[in-house]
């Protein structure tokens, strides 16, 4: 799931663009660093792309690809401001560069600037519709608690990519928050078929079972979520609620442990319609 207050599931950056070797950088190694997706460090990628830019031999669309690649590296390093600047340069050089719009949206998303992210995702989807683009836009809607539009986008993502586990997971959460519990349960179960050990999906399904008053099933899913990720407040608090509703006073210690990890966890559950009771 993608809960703004607990865990924002990462959006999907468009892969690095390989610019080709029509012009030479300062060294072949620096170009390889700029274009490589997996074999180099983030700092090497930044250095390589910076060398290509400084050499001044790339122009137009080719130079846009270099700026996009360096922006991806800055984003991976957590330097969103520089990433946004590089994506902006890429877009100025190539106004139809869908990947740069998508990637700038991801950077805005990471900074909590969801309206700007939505505008960039919108443009990316106009230029080149993709499952990842719809998923990213859905995440921005979800962060704004615009659950209906988020669900619409996850529908499109799943239509284009039937095994998109993260889209099933996030659609599950959006539906759960809206109280559309049976479809939400189906989505979480499908996400778990695709990624069985996903703690976030397990605690989403546990939350659905909690709302359905199926407390044993809720405890089972929260137990599984905590086995894979033991220091998370959301499943701890949910398990505590489910235990208390089942008459098990061990729920008190779960809820206390959850509050120690996240002081406002009770308020978060209350926003989703699950108040603490004694």
List where the protein language model places each region.
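TPR-repeat structural position
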Residues: 42, 80, 114, 147, ...
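Structural marker of alpha-solenoid helical repeat scaffolds
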Residues: 55, 59, 93, 127, ...
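Terminal, low-structured helical/coil segments at or just beyond the last alpha-helical repeat
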Residues: 28-33, 241-278
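Conserved alpha-helical positions within TPR/SEL1-like repeat arrays
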Residues: 35-37, 65-75, 99-110, 132-143, ...
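Canonical positions in the second alpha-helix
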Residues: 52, 56, 89-90, 123-124, ...
């Amino acid at each position: 799931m993608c809960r703004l207050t607990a865990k924002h599931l990462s959006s999907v950056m468009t892969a690095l663009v390989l610019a080709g070797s029509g012009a030479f950088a300062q060294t072949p190694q620096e170009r390889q660093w700029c274009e490589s997706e997996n074999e180099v460090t983030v700092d090497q990628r930044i250095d390589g792309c910076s060398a290509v830019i400084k050499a001044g031999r790339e122009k137009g669309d080719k130079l846009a690809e270099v700026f996009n690649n360096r922006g991806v590296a800055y984003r991976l390093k957590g330097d969103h401001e520089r990433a946004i600047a590089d994506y902006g340069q890429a877009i100025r050089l190539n106004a139809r560069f869908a990947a740069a719009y998508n990637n700038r949206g991801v950077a805005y998303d990471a900074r909590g600037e969801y309206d700007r992210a939505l505008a960039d995702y919108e443009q990316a989807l106009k230029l080149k519709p993709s499952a990842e683009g719809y998923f990213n836009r859905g995440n921005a809607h979800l962060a704004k608690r615009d659950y209906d539009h988020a669900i619409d986008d996850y529908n499109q993502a799943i239509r284009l990519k039937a095994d998109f586990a993260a889209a099933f997971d996030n659609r599950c959460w959006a539906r759960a928050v809206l109280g559309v519990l049976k479809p939400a349960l189906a989505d979480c179960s499908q996400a778990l078929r695709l990624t069985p050990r996903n703690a976030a999906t397990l605690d989403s399904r546990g939350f659905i079972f909690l709302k359905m008053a199926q407390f044993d099933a809720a405890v089972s899913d929260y137990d599984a979520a905590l086995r894979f990720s033991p220091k998370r407040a959301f499943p701890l608090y949910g398990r505590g609620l489910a235990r208390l509703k089942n008459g098990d006073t061990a729920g008190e210690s779960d809820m206390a442990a959850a509050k120690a990890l996240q002081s406002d966890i009770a308020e978060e559950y209350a926003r989703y319609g699950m108040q603490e009771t004694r």
